[in-house]
Amino acid sequence: MRKGAFAACLLISSGALCAAAEAQTCAAPEFLNTMVMEPVAGSDLMTVPVTVNGKQKKFLISTSEPITMVSQAMVRDLGLPETTYMAGARELNVRGSHSADDARTRVRVAELGLGTQKGSGLQFLVSDDRELGNAKPYDGLLSSDLFSNYDVDLDFGARRLNYFGPNHCPGNVVYWSQRPIAVIPITLMGSKINVPVTIDGQKINAVIDTGATRTSMRRDIAELTFGLKADTPSMMPAGDLRDGHGATVYSHAFQLLSLEGVDVKNPTILIQTNAMVRNRDSGMSLESRAQRTEPRPPDLTIGMDLLHQLHVYIASGEKKLYVTAAGTGETEVFKAVVAPAGR
């Protein structure tokens, strides 16, 4: 079989269709890059290894943040020079080429390595989170500015972050599974991936956030849509967790969260008024982002406590999410794509 037809067959879930695929002229997604995910101890969060000026570092995968950022600790460690001058400055994409960005206070990076790709002459925003790189055991956030122009394959079962080209036949992406597949329309609001979900029979909107440790629901949705009431057996305080205004954060065990037929059973979800952040002192806290210039938190934020149970393919060109239950380990078809490239 010709190499191109073989690649097309790899991206079709039924082997019986390979003969038909060879005759088709539509393209399968182009495999671009892969990185091995590494779990953050004590949570379901995932980092990927990167190199910054030749030094090994770890970046947290954060799909809801708009801009890739580096920690103040890494800036000090590597002696990265600060800059506000952006003329001619460029950012890395997964092919190793670059794109212009708006002027912001940043640091200069001579070389950044992501998987098999490297870029040079880069600038990155420095995070104002002083715990990044210290109490938080990663050195930066790998965010949506490096995702939006590509298909992103989050294979949590195999612990792989894969990049594919966005130009392909609609639906011709699920190479990994015979398991039930959910095809979900996505709406991008800023950097956030919004999807419809069903919880206990009620349809609400959700944001996919790989940077969130826990899945959380806005309190008014819990009370008005699901009839929950604070300080009752069905909505008890989540330990001593409080938001930025000192209000109690609650939790509730729902029966079923469904993504177009791919189900997560008995999810325990935090219930809060304000968006989830980390407390700078210790543990988790919540801080209000419902300010005049910012929208309210989403109805539901799906965090890594649930996402790690799934295989999620973000098809940016189609504006669709392809989701199955997570597998165990790398699939044979993925190995066939990666091994010849020496990745």
What residue ranges belong to the model's regions?
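Positively charged n-region of N-terminal signal peptides that target proteins for export
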Residues: M1-G4
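Bacterial N-terminal signal peptides
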Residues: A7-A16
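Pepsin/retropepsin-fold aspartyl endopeptidases
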Residues: A20-R343
